[in-house]
């Protein structure tokens, strides 16, 4: 395969990997709120949405950090 073809394939794979699956768009968000920001290195992306996290965990965003965290509930 030519280098141009490989570059196109790589670009398409990258775009495909970044797109959110349509099936997650119609799902409601999980209950609860994200806890305070953890102390971690910058720009870690562990998840893209709640449904990529196990159990009741939520996909929480702290700046450029995305990670699965146990929710907190405020009364």
UniProtKB/Swiss-Prot annotation:
UniProt keyword terms in alphabetical order: Antibiotic, Antimicrobial, Disulfide bond, Secreted, Signal
Domain WAP residue range list: 27-72
GO biological process: antibacterial humoral response; innate immune response; venom-mediated disruption of cell wall in another organism
Localization (cell): Secreted
Tissues where the protein occurs: Expressed by the venom gland.
Gene Ontology CC: one annotated term: extracellular space
An MF annotation (GO) of this entry: serine-type endopeptidase inhibitor activity
Disulfide bonds, paired cysteine numbers: 34-60, 43-64, 47-59, 53-68
Chief location of this protein within or outside the cell: secreted
Signal peptide: 1-24
SMART domains: WAP
Alphabetized PROSITE patterns for the sequence: WAP
Homology family: Belongs to the venom waprin family.
Cited function: Damages membranes of susceptible bacteria. Has no hemolytic activity. Not toxic to mice. Does not inhibit the proteinases elastase and cathepsin G.
UniProt-recorded name of the protein: Notewaprin-a
Organism (species): Notechis scutatus scutatus
């Amino acid at each position: 395969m030519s280098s141009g073809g490989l570059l196109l394939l790589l670009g398409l794979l990258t775009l495909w990997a970044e797109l959110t699956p349509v099936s997650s768009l119609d799902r409601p968000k999980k209950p609860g709120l994200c806890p305070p920001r953890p102390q971690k290195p910058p720009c870690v992306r562990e998840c893209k949405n709640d449904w990529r996290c196990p159990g009741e965990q939520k996909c929480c965003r702290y700046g450029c950090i995305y990670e699965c965290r146990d929710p907190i509930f405020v009364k």
